[in-house]
C-alpha cells in the first residue's frame, strides 16, 4: 500500500511516501521510501525543493510564486530520474494531511470532502498561518492526483477529551457556546509519543500518568492520564502557553489592547509581533533557533541569556501545572527539535522536579538518546526522549481508513 503524507506549514511543504506490505502494521515506524521537502523562505525570489530517495539527495530551485508547479515538480520526482520509487502516481492509494485546526467539528481522522474543506477554511481565523497551507495542499493534490482519497488528521482531535472546566475560558458563557474555548494543538505528536512511551515502559497506556513536552519552534505540553488528554498548554490558538521560538506564549491579555489603544498598533501588527517577533527571537534579538541562542550566550550576549532563562522558567511553570492536573507522574517525555536534541533544556527542566524523586542520568542525557529512558535506575519518575513520528502517525490513520473498508 502506497501512502503519501503531506505536512504543510505556512512556508514549507514536507512530504513522504510509505510503502506498507502485509496485513498488519509494523511494530516500529518504518522509514519512508521517499521524502520531499519544499522551503519557500530560502530566498525572496525562489524556493528550494529537496528530494531524498534511493540513497540519492537532490536539490532544485523553484519559482517562489508558483506553489502548484513546485508541488508538481516534487511529485514528478516520485516517478522520474534517480529518485523514482514508483512507476505511476496512480499507485498512490491515499494521501494523508496534517491539519492543525479542526475545531469541535472533527475529533478523529476524516475523509476530505467539500464540507471538510469548507470547515478548514472557516477555521482559518483560528489558525491563520497553517489552515490556508493545508487547504492549498489538499486542492493541489486534487489537481495533480485526481480522485485519490485524501484523509485529514487533525492536531486538535487528541485534545477533544479535555474536561470542560479545562477547555472553557473564564469569559461570558455565551462566548463558549460560540466556540471561544481552548482546543489544544500538536495532538498528533502528543498522541504518538504517549503510545510510544507506554511501549518503551512496557506498561498499559491506560495505567499511566504522563507529561509530553513537544518542544520545537512551536511548543506545547500535554497532561495525559490513562491515554486521554486532560490538560494542555495551547488554547484557542497555538499562541497560548509556553514561550516559543518566535511566539510569545501566554501574556497579560491587556497588553495587545494597550498597544492598539495607546500606541497606534493595528490588530494585524500585534498578531505579527506575537507570532513572529516574540519568544526567544524577540527577547534575544538573535534568532528563534535555540542553537543560535546558546552560541550567543557563550559569546556573552546577556539578552540571549535572559531569553533562555525565561524559556526554562516558563517550561518548568507549565510542567508544574500539568503535574497538578495529573496528581502524580509516571514519566516526563521530551520530543520535537529542542526536546529531542537539547540536553541542556532537558537537564534544566528536570532539575526543578527533584522533589518528586526524579533523577536524570547525565551520561544518558548527553548521549543523543532516541526512544530511550534517560532517568537513573532509582528515579521515581522515568524521563523519556522520544523521536516524534507525526508522518508515521498520519500514515497509520490512512492505513486504518483503507483496511476498514
Curated annotation (Swiss-Prot):
Per its record, the protein catalyses: acetate + ATP = acetyl phosphate + ADP
Q: Which keywords does UniProt give here? A: ATP-binding, Cytoplasm, Kinase, Magnesium, Metal-binding, Nucleotide-binding, Transferase
Residue sites binding Mg(2+) per the record: 7, 390
Q: Entry cofactor note text?
A: Mg(2+). Can also accept Mn(2+).
Q: What top-level branch of life does the organism fall under?
A: Bacteria
Annotated GO CC locations: cytoplasm
Q: Which CDD domains match?
A: ASKHA_NBD_AcK_PK
- The answer on whether this UniProt entry bears the keyword Cytoplasm reads yes
Q: Which terms in the Gene Ontology molecular function aspect does this entry carry?
A: acetate kinase activity; ATP binding; magnesium ion binding
Q: Which positions carry the signal peptide feature in this UniProt record?
A: none
**Which is an annotated Pfam family here?**
Acetate_kinase
Protein name as catalogued: Acetate kinase
Name its species: Gloeothece citriformis (strain PCC 7424)
Q: What is the lineage of its organism?
A: Bacteria, Bacillati, Cyanobacteriota, Cyanophyceae, Oscillatoriophycideae
Q: Which gene encodes it?
A: ackA
